[in-house]
Amino acid sequence: MRRRSSMDINRAIRVAVDTGNVVLGTKQAIKNIKHGEGQLVIIADNCAKDVREDIFYYTQLSETPVYTHQATSIELGAICGKPFPVSALLVLEPGNSAILNVNNEE
């Protein structure tokens, strides 16, 4: 089985942002996860430890999968087409993207 390259994952994230419904930012992601919304959380590699712990706590309660991207928050923001850092994003609807097929196995 072929592992997904970071370019495939980056493309899937961008397609999800462009065609689906995605929430950007840690505060909004956590808020939506608490309400049981979302299908996948993607966090940047350099996401703050306390925020990362909060995200993992609430995703365990809601059984929402988490993918830790190997990009920094600045790079993740650029992947999303935004001029600001993005430490976390929550995929509510993937749109035309195959982002939900991503796994965290390295």
From Swiss-Prot:
One GO CC term on file: cytosolic large ribosomal subunit
Record keywords: Ribonucleoprotein, Ribosomal protein
Keyword Transmembrane: no
Entry's Gene Ontology BP terms: translation
Annotated TM spans: none
InterPro entries in the cross-refs: Ribosomal_eL30, Ribosomal_eL30-like, Ribosomal_eL30-like_sf, Ribosomal_eL30_CS, Ribosomal_eL8/eL30/eS12/Gad45
Gene Ontology MF, one: structural constituent of ribosome
HAMAP family (alphabetical): Ribosomal_eL30
Similarity comment text for this entry: Belongs to the eukaryotic ribosomal protein eL30 family.
Protein name (record): Large ribosomal subunit protein eL30
Gene symbol of the encoding locus: rpl30e
